[in-house]
Swiss-Prot record:
Organism listed in the record: Helicobacter pylori (strain HPAG1)
EC number: 2.5.1.145
Binding site for a 1,2-diacyl-sn-glycero-3-phospho-(1'-sn-glycerol): 155
Name of the protein in its database record: Phosphatidylglycerol--prolipoprotein diacylglyceryl transferase
HAMAP family: Lgt
Length: 279
């Protein structure tokens, strides 16, 4: 057993307190994710204005729409897909975004679905671009580049918050014994960090490679969608399935099933992008 294995015993997920409000590292990590994505996008606009002919003010307005769509979609998606008491929230809709518990204590909003956030993002992007759909693919490509590195901070936030834990490390896994984290007296894979690397860093490199080798608008978001789906599918083998969900057909987790649907959506965007490139 090394110091890394027991890091959760030595780490407080609460960064600091403001009166009765506890600020978690989780929240700070997500703030870093948003800031990273925002400035990464601005850098791309400045560096490649021909590919991303968007004014800063225009992008700032779009970014607000996209963020709102992501938050709404992620939270509602979690309620519909993962929340065992979804019927309660559907009849008490205001509770979906209530950051206080029954005692009035600030606990934040917990329970977000990445795939739900993706749906919300696509809807928000379409609504914002509906008056000029020619810009839709430009916006999507821009987010495809700026999102992955921000996503890394999001998964680090999950790790610091000690949630979305990994599967139990087999006793015969030498690497697992080294990188595993003790959770409830069981050594588990640090699945959040595995996801940060695969779904963040690797997907970012995929999109940057595509940016270098293609000029067709819409292909970057397609590469992102397909790359993320593949990396998430792999990472799910190290992540403990949600206790209320378990596994399904062929022992696939809900995350893997939703990633397969994401492939279909990505191929649909590919058809749309290919069709528009010929106009």
């Amino acid at each position: 057993m090394n110091a890394w294995n027991t890091i959760y015993d030595q780490f407080n997920p609460i960064a600091f307190s403001l009166g009765s409000i506890e600020v978690h590292w989780y929240g700070l990590a997500y703030a870093c994710a948003i800031v990273t994505a925002f400035y990464m996008a601005l850098r791309m606009i400045q560096k490649d204005p021909k590919r991303f002919p968007i004014e800063r003010k225009e992008f700032e307005s779009y970014f607000l729409w996209a963020e709102l769509g992501i938050v709404l979609g992620a939270r509602i998606g979690y309620i519909l897909i993962y929340e065992p008491n979804s019927s309660y929230y559907l009849t008490h809709f205001w509770q979906i975004f209530n950051p206080f518990d029954s005692h009035g204590n600030f606990v934040g909003i917990r329970g977000m679905s990445y795939h739900g956030g993706l749906v919300g993002f696509l809807i928000a992007s379409y609504l914002y671009s509906r008056k000029d759909l020619k810009k839709l693919l430009i916006y999507l490509d821009l987010i495809a580049i700026s999102l992955p590195l921000g996503y890394v901070f999001g998964r680090i936030g999950n790790f610091l918050n000690q949630e979305l834990v990994g599967r139990i490390v087999p006793k015969d896994s030498h690497l697992g014994q080294i990188i595993g984290i003790m959770v409830d007296n069981q050594l588990r894979y640090p699945s959040q960090l595995i996801e940060a690397f695969l779904e963040g860093v690797i997907v970012f490199l995929m999109v940057m490679w595509a940016k270098k080798h293609t000029k067709t608008r819409g292909l970057l978001i397609v590469v992102y969608g397909l790359g993320y789906s593949l990396m998430r599918f792999i990472a799910e083998f190290y992540r403990e399935p949600d206790s209320q969900m378990g596994v399904y057909f062929l022992n696939l987790s809900m995350g893997q099933i939703l990633s397969l649907f994401m492939v279909i959506v990505s191929l649909g965007i590919l058809l749309y992008a290919t069709k528009n490139s010929k106009k």
